[in-house]
Curated annotation (Swiss-Prot):
It is found in: Cytoplasm, Cytoskeleton. May modify the assembly dynamics of microtubules, such that microtubules are slightly longer, but more dynamic. This is Echinoderm microtubule-associated protein-like elp-1. Its main location: cytoplasm. Residues 77-88, 118-131 have a biased composition (Polar residues). GO terms for biological process: microtubule cytoskeleton organization. Residues 104-117 have a biased composition (Low complexity). One of its GO terms (cellular component) is neuronal cell body. It comes from the Eukaryota. WD repeats lie at residues 330-401, 404-447, 499-537, 541-579, 626-664, 708-747, 753-792, 816-853, 859-890. It comes from Caenorhabditis elegans. GO terms for molecular function: microtubule binding. Residues 77-167 are annotated as: Disordered.
Length: 891
C-alpha cells in the first residue's frame, strides 16, 4: 500500500525501526493490552463474587428470620384461641433485591434515583432540590392483612455491591403508636434524635435457645458499625452451678473462674436483665484532630468554629466565654475532612470506611423498633462504608449522603464560581480517584485518577470557572472540568531549576488568580494557573517545610512552617510584612491557619487549637489542648478535676467545669498508667522505662520515685488507706509499697511467679486485699502482705475500685463479648464498659445476665482506653488512637 507522496508505509517503518524491534514493540503492546483486559475482567468478577456473597447472606438471614418468626407464631397460636391467628401479620417478601420493613408507607425515606447516593431529605433548598413526598410505595401492595412494607434504599457498599437490609436486621414493633408516629413524623436525622445513644435489650432466652444453629446465621449485621474492629460474639454457653460458688466465663478459648458473692448463688445468667433507665447526652468534646489531616477547621458567620474529633463534627462558639458546643452526630467512623459551602450554611464532611464483608457480624439482637425515627437512625448507624455527608449547620440535619467510595475520603471541596453546585471528592484508595458530583441530585458527573501517590488537598479555583487544583506527595496538578461531558483534563505543573521539592505541602489562592504553594524545601511559589508555571518564588523561608498557607483579609498571605513560625507575606514582592509569630514548642507547628477579621485561629500538629489576635501575637490562648502522641490514661480527681496522660510524656489536670487546663507537665518518657489517692492530693505515674513517681498535686512536688527495672510499668494503684500502693511491671512482677509519715519508702511485699503481666489492679475497701487481671485474662487475688488468696475467701470482699474487667461486676459482659471489654468504671448501681469497637455500654451493676440490656454511647471511632465517673451523672471517656476525650451527661 502506498501513501500520497509515493513512499510505502513499510519502507518508512524500516527506516525508523529495524523489523525485529518493531515486532518486539508490537508484541509488548499486545501483551499490555491483554493484561489490561484480564485485569478488568478480574475486577468485574470480584465485584460479581462480592455481590453474590451478599445475596447468599441475605437469603440465609431472611430464611432464618422466617423460620424463627413462624416458630414464635406457632407458640403464640397454641397459647391463644384458635381464631386468633398471628399469621396475618407476618411480613411477606416482595422482591429479592428490595429491603423491607413492616412500617407504614405514608412517610417512607426517599429513594434516590442514583444507586450510589442516598438523600435523607432536602428541605428549603433551591428549585433543583428534592423533597420528601408521602406518596405510595412503588412495589406491589402487601397482602394478607399486612400494614404495608416500605423499600428503603441504603446506597452501595464500598465495593459497589448493593447493601440490602432484610427485616431480620430491624424488628419493627406492630403497635398503634408506631402506625400513628409513622404517619405524622418525617424520617430524618436531626439533633433532637440524639443518635449517639441506643438502648439495647437482647432477645429472651427462649428465642436464643430455640434453634442455636439457625440463630447464629441471623447475626450478619453489625450492632456497632462506627468501628473498624467489630466485636466478636462468644458462642459458648455460660453455665453456673449454684453449689460451686464460682462463675465460669470463657474468654479467648480460656475458662476463668470468677467468685460469686453471697446473695447471687441462685442467679441464672441466661435470664434477661433490663437496661438502666436514663437519658444520655454528649456534653463536651475536649479533643481536636489536627496532626494528620488538612482542611479541618471552618468558621461560620455565627461565630462558631467547626472542627472534628473521632466520629463527631463540633461547632464551638468562640465568641463567648462559655465555649458552648453543638455537635453533629451523623458519621459512623472517623471524620477525615470538612469544607464549608459558599452560602456559609452547609458543610460537607467525609469519613473513612469501616465496612468489611468479613467483619460484618451482629453480636447481639435488639429490641423491636417502635418509630420511624428509630428505623432511620438504625439505618444511619449501619452506614459503615466511606461516604460524604452534606448537612445543615443550623438544624444539624443531613441533606445528602454520597456513596460509592472505597477506603476513605481525604478531601472534599465545593465549587466557588457557580454557587457551590458541584462538589469535588478525593477517595483515599489505592487508585486515588477524584470525582465531581452534582451533590443536590446525588449524581457523579465525572471521575479521574488524580495521581499515583497520596493526595493532600483539592480546591476549586475561586475565579476561574471549572478549574481544580490538586496536590500531594510528589505531585501538583491542574484539572479542567468540562460540565457537558464530565471529562477532567489533567495538566501537571513542573518546578524549574535543580532544587525541585519532593512534596507540595500546602496551597491557597491569591487575589489576582494566582495559586500559591508551599513545599518541603521551605519555598513559597506563586503560579500562573493558565500557563502552569511559577512566576515568583521565595526560597527557604520555613526550614523543614511550609505546612500551611491562607489568604488574609488584607490580601496578604499567612504561612506556617515546621519551624513553628507564622509569617505574613506581600504577594507583590513576596516579602515579609511583619515580625513572625513563634508558637510554643509544646504546641507543635501550624497545620492550618484561619483568619476571622483580626482574630487568628491556628490548628497545630499536636492536636491543639490556638486562638489569638494577629496584632498581639503574644496573647495566644488554647481553645483545645492536645498531644501528638496517643492518650494512655484518663481518670477523675475530686469533684471538678480530670487527669489525662499521653505517650509523649504529657500529664494534664483539667478543670472540667471551666473546660481549662489547670496544670500541665512534660516528662521525657511515655506515661503508661496513672492513679490518684483517696484524698485527691497525691498522684502516682508509671512510665515506659520502668520508672514510677509519686507527686503531690497541690504543691506539684515529687514525693518519691523509683526505677523498678527496664520493663515498662503496666499498672499502678493506691489503696483506700492512702499510704499504700501497688506497682506492676511487664517482667512480670508486682510490688506493694507504703510511704510512712516521714516520707520514707517501705516495701511491704514483692510478688513474683505471675503468669502474665498485670494490666489492672484493685484494692479492697479496707485495703487488706488486692486483685489483678493479667494480659492472659487471669484473675488473681492476694492479701496486702503478698500472699495468694483463693477466690472463695474473697468472694464477699467489697472492692474500692473496678479497673479489673473480669471481676464479678462485669464478668458476664466480658464473656458475652469474648473479652472485648477494654475499660470499666462503676458508680453506685451502674457500670460503664468501654469496648474494643469504640462504643461505651451502660449496664445495671452488677451484670447478672449474658443477655443484659445496656445503653450504648457512640462517638469514638476506635478502642476505648479509659472510662471514669466524676459522679453518677457525669462520665468521661477517651480513645488513644484518635486522641478523643468526651464528657457525657447521664440523667
Amino acid at each position: 500500500m502506498s501513501i500520497s507522496n509515493g513512499w510505502s508505509s513499510s519502507s518508512i517503518i524500516s527506516d525508523v525501526l529495524p523489523e525485529e524491534e518493531f515486532e518486539e514493540v508490537e508484541e509488548d503492546e499486545l501483551i499490555l493490552n491483554e493484561n489490561d483486559r484480564l485485569k478488568f475482567r478480574v475486577d468485574e468478577l470480584e465485584k460479581i463474587v462480592v455481590a453474590q456473597r451478599n445475596e447468599i447472606l441475605l437469603l440465609q438471614s431472611s430464611t432464618v428470620e422466617i423460620l424463627r418468626r413462624l416458630q414464635n407464631l406457632e407458640i403464640q397460636d397454641q397459647s391463644r384461641s384458635p381464631t386468633c391467628s398471628g399469621y396475618s401479620s407476618l411480613p411477606r417478601r416482595i422482591s429479592g433485591s428490595k429491603s423491607s420493613y413492616t412500617m407504614s408507607p405514608s412517610h417512607a425515606p426517599p429513594r434516590s434515583s442514583h444507586a450510589n447516593s442516598k438523600s435523607l431529605y432536602i428541605n428549603g433548598m433551591n428549585n433543583n432540590s428534592e423533597e420528601v413526598s408521602p406518596g405510595p410505595p412503588r412495589h406491589r401492595p402487601p397482602t394478607r392483612g399486612s400494614d404495608g412494607m416500605v423499600n428503603v434504599s441504603v446506597g452501595k457498599s464500598a465495593r459497589g455491591s448493593p447493601m440490602r437490609k432484610w427485616v431480620s436486621t430491624h424488628d419493627m414493633k406492630d403497635t398503634d403508636r408506631f402506625r400513628r408516629l409513622s404517619t405524622s413524623s418525617e424520617a430524618s436525622t436531626s439533633a433532637t434524635m440524639n443518635p449517639i445513644v441506643n438502648s439495647v435489650r437482647r432477645l429472651s432466652t427462649t428465642h436464643r435457645q430455640s434453634s442455636p444453629s439457625l440463630l447464629s446465621l441471623c447475626s450478619v449485621i453489625s450492632r456497632s458499625p462506627s468501628t473498624s474492629s467489630i466485636l466478636r460474639k462468644n458462642n459458648r454457653t455460660c453455665q453456673f452451678s449454684n453449689g460451686s460458688g464460682h462463675l465460669p466465663i470463657f474468654i479467648g478459648g480460656k475458662t476463668v473462674q470468677v467468685p460469686v458473692p453471697t446473695g447471687y448463688e441462685n442467679m441464672d445468667p441466661t435470664m434477661d436483665q433490663d437496661p438502666p433507665t436514663m437519658k444520655v447526652t454528649l456534653k463536651h468534646v475536649y479533643s481536636y484532630r489536627g496532626k494528620d489531616v488538612r482542611s479541618n477547621i471552618e468558621m461560620l458567620p455565627t461565630g462558631e468554629l467547626v472542627f472534628f474529633s473521632a466520629n463527631l463534627v463540633v461547632l464551638m462558639n468562640i465568641t463567648g466565654e462559655d465555649r458552648s458546643q453543638r455537635i453533629y452526630h451523623g458519621h459512623t467512623c472517623d471524620v477525615k475532612c470538612i469544607t464549608l459551602h459558599p452560602n456559609k450554611i452547609l458543610v460537607a464532611s467525609g469519613q473513612s470506611s469501616c465496612h468489611s464483608v468479613e467483619k460484618f457480624q451482629k453480636p447481639e439482637h435488639t429490641s423491636p423498633i417502635d418509630s420511624p425515627e428509630d428505623l432511620v437512625r438504625q439505618l444511619e448507624m449501619e452506614h459503615t462504608e466511606a461516604h460524604v455527608r452534606i448537612w445543615d449547620t443550623i438544624k444539624l440535619t443531613t441533606l445528602m449522603v454520597l456513596n460509592g467510595f472505597e477506603k476513605g475520603i481525604c478531601h472534599v471541596a465545593f465549587s466557588k464560581t457557580d454557587s457551590g453546585s458541584l462538589l469535588a471528592v478525593v477517595d483515599d484508595s489505592l487508585k486515588h480517584l477524584m470525582s465531581v458530583w452534582n451533590w443536590q441530585k446525588g449524581k457523579r458527573e465525572g471521575e479521574v485518577k488524580a495521581s499515583n501517590d497520596v493526595v493532600f488537598e483539592c480546591k476549586w479555583h475561586p475565579t476561574i470557572r471549572n478549574l481544580i487544583v490538586l496536590y500531594g506527595k510528589g505531585h501538583f496538578s491542574f484539572f479542567n472540568y468540562d460540565p457537558a461531558t464530565g471529562v477532567l483534563v489533567k495538566t501537571v505543573a513542573t518546578f524549574e531549576g535543580r532544587d525541585k521539592p519532593k512534596t507540595v505541602l500546602s496551597m491557597c489562592f491569591g487575589e489576582n488568580d494566582q495559586v500559591v504553594t508551599g513545599d518541603s524545601n521551605g519555598t513559597i511559589s506563586i503560579w500562573d494557573p493558565r500557563t502552569c508555571k511559577t512566576t515568583k518564588q521565595a526560597h527557604s523561608v520555613h526550614p523543614g517545610g511550609v505546612y500551611s498557607l491562607t489568604l488574609a483579609k488584607s490580601g496578604k498571605i499567612l504561612s506556617g512552617g515546621k519551624d513553628r513560625m507564622v509569617s505574613e507575606w506581600d504577594l507583590q514582592d513576596l516579602v515579609r510584612t511583619r515580625r513572625p509569630i513563634e508558637l510554643p514548642d509544646e504546641k507543635g507547628f501550624p497545620r492550618v491557619i484561619l483568619q476571622n477579621g483580626s482574630e487568628l485561629i491556628i490548628g497545630t500538629s499536636s492536636n491543639t487549637l490556638l486562638f489569638g489576635n494577629i496584632e498581639n501575637s503574644t496573647n495566644l490562648t488554647s481553645l483545645i489542648e492536645g498531644d501528638p502522641g496517643n492518650l494512655t490514661f484518663l481518670l477523675t480527681c475530686s469533684s471538678n478535676q480530670l487527669i489525662t496522660s499521653s505517650q509523649c510524656g504529657t500529664l494534664r489536670i483539667w478543670n472540667h467545669i471551666d473546660k481549662k487546663v489547670e496544670f500541665s507537665k512534660k516528662f521525657i518518657d511515655s506515661v503508661e498508667c496513672v492513679d490518684v489517692d483517696v484524698t485527691n492530693t497525691h498522684i502516682i505515674l508509671g512510665f515506659a522505662a520502668g520508672l514510677w513517681i509519686v507527686m503531690n498535686i497541690t504543691k506539684q512536688q515529687t514525693i518519691q520515685e523509683k526505677k523498678e527495672g527496664t520493663a515498662p510499668i503496666t499498672a499502678v494503684k493506691f489503696a483506700p488507706s492512702g499510704a499504700t500502693f501497688a506497682v506492676a511491671t511487664k517482667d512480670p512482677h508486682l510490688t506493694i509499697y507504703r510511704i510512712d509519715a516521714s516520707k520514707n519508702l517501705l516495701v511491704i511485699a514483692r510478688i513474683h511467679h505471675i503468669p502474665a503481666p498485670i494490666v489492672a489492679l484493685d484494692f479492697s475497701s479496707d485495703s487488706q486485699y488486692l486483685r489483678g487481671q493479667s494480659i492472659g485474662a487471669h484473675l488473681l487475688f492476694w492479701t496486702k502482705a503478698g500472699e495468694i488468696c483463693d477466690g472463695t475467701s474473697v468472694k464477699d470482699v467489697k472492692w474500692g475500685s473496678s479497673r479489673v474487667k473480669i471481676g464479678f461486676e462485669t464478668a458476664l459482659v466480658a464473656h458475652s463479648s469474648n473479652g472485648q471489654v477494654t475499660a470499666v468504671a462503676q458508680c453506685e448501681d451502674i457500670s460503664a464498659c468501654g469496648m474494643e469497637n469504640g462504643t461505651i455500654r451502660i449496664y445495671k451493676n452488677p451484670v447478672t445476665s449474658v443477655t443484659a440490656g445496656f445503653v450504648e454511647l457512640l462517638g469514638h471511632g476506635r478502642i476505648i482506653k479509659s472510662v471514669a465517673f466524676s459522679n453518677k451523672i457525669q462520665l468521661f471517656s477517651c480513645s488513644p488512637t484518635d486522641n478523643s476525650v468526651f464528657e457525657w451527661c447521664l440523667e
